[in-house]
Amino acid sequence: RDRVSFGMQSAVPAVLRTLDRRHDPAKLPGLVIAARQLGLDVSVDLIYGAPGESLQDWEVSLREAIAMEPNHISAYALVIEEGTKMGMQVARGELPMPDPDDEASKYEIADRLLGEAGYAWYEISNFARRESGEEGCPSTQLRHASRHNLAYWRDWDWWGFGPGAHSHVGRYRWWNVTVSY
């Protein structure tokens, strides 16, 4: 089945502002319902470790994502890249670097909550919802494990649609702009 991934990142508006994301997290449940009505599998992407994000903020985001019952959840640790807006804010001392101990705690919270909700960890940042009969199945063979992730590691082609989406076809990689005009 085809899958759509929603870049939720966080359910906490203050964290989204720190990440320079402009969407309203309250609209996502309706979009998830619409995607399911179209027959699509749903994945939700989260980012943890934003400056100022508390353990409670992260838990709220995880619980909001789990409540939508997506087939797949990615939980990525924030990486602050040199030359980006956030990288420059950190370099100027306006934002702190993520605390590795805090990030480790957030990963452990994700592993616990997602496991309790029936998601199986299969790749460093990825969790797929187990279906009936998949209890003993190797995690990389789960129905909801991401084919895109497999395609990425095997250098297969994929197309990304929407703001900031990445694509790879042949030897070419590109991404869409995130700013609307």
Per-range role (PLM):
Residues 1-181:
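C-terminal scaffold of the Radical SAM
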